[in-house]
Swiss-Prot record:
InterPro entries: DNA_pol3_clamp-load_cplx_C, DNA_pol3_delt_C, DNA_pol3_delta_N, DNA_polIII_delta, P-loop_NTPase. Residues 1-140 are annotated as: Domain 1. One of its GO terms (biological process) is DNA replication. Residues 211-343 are annotated as: Domain 3. This is DNA polymerase III subunit delta. It comes from the Bacteria. One of its GO terms (cellular component) is DNA polymerase III complex. Residues 141-210 are annotated as: Domain 2. Keywords: DNA replication, DNA-directed DNA polymerase, Nucleotidyltransferase, Transferase. It comes from Escherichia coli (strain K12). Pfam families: DNA_pol3_delt_C, DNA_pol3_delta. Its EC number is 2.7.7.7. It is an enzyme of class 2 (transferase).
Amino acid sequence: MIRLYPEQLRAQLNEGLRAAYLLLGNDPLLLQESQDAVRQVAAAQGFEEHHTFSIDPNTDWNAIFSLCQAMSLFASRQTLLLLLPENGPNAAINEQLLTLTGLLHDDLLLIVRGNKLSKAQENAAWFTALANRSVQVTCQTPEQAQLPRWVAARAKQLNLELDDAANQVLCYCYEGNLLALAQALERLSLLWPDGKLTLPRVEQAVNDAAHFTPFHWVDALLMGKSKRALHILQQLRLEGSEPVILLRTLQRELLLLVNLKRQSAHTPLRALFDKHRVWQNRRGMMGEALNRLSQTQLRQAVQLLTRTELTLKQDYGQSVWAELEGLSLLLCHKPLADVFIDG
């Protein structure tokens, strides 16, 4: 199976259409643009009919199979778009998809769109059956480290000259929100017809529309990035996130840190990570936090988190965003006012 990113898709399509395109990921912009690109190239090659089915327990699979088999001398070529359920295909859907793979032909182009599949879902028979004749396009929202490269490529597409400082501002303001980022670049191209995007020009035209989850906040805390952690917290507050969800998300990681710190005095970290089943991609930031924070600081963080939870239990309407900021600074190893630590 050919695996590529959305920015590589156009080049592959120009080489020749495959039997199926699997558009998988969580980013609405990348999914939609990839879908549009496949259908656009297919239309240029005579695929004039486009059919779309949302897959759920009530899907009429016989209608889909009939569509695949309805061939006549005058029938036009057609694309078939299947929208997978949010959690991906279950066993029953896998069976139907396997049947469908046996009905594909040169005048039918299959497009499957959905969230990223798990390893178990990728081992399903239908997925394996498509391996030699399909393209998988990874449509995940770029992480912080990959975002500047995406912005630079997008700017180049629009014939914009973007300096590094301007790129950083765009990433800061629109991380996790590619649709708003793409719209900002298009707006900037209209504002500045010469295509030169300097820092002052970009700062005049952007607004902070980054989108984060509580996990982004926790990751920033583990890495000791106080400025980023406070920015994420501000955006989560503006979006109406529930503080109790932030506290629960942090609590799990904080208690794990406390245990790891205590046990690391006599056991190697790698063995502890294995024992506590810490994912490989989280071990680096966990190690950073353990090296940076003392047992005293971790104990203070647990006390502050517990006190904040009690405040919410006693009065759910009470604002605890100041306490969450205090927690952020404490875990990023910044000096805290005594009011946070001593209560």
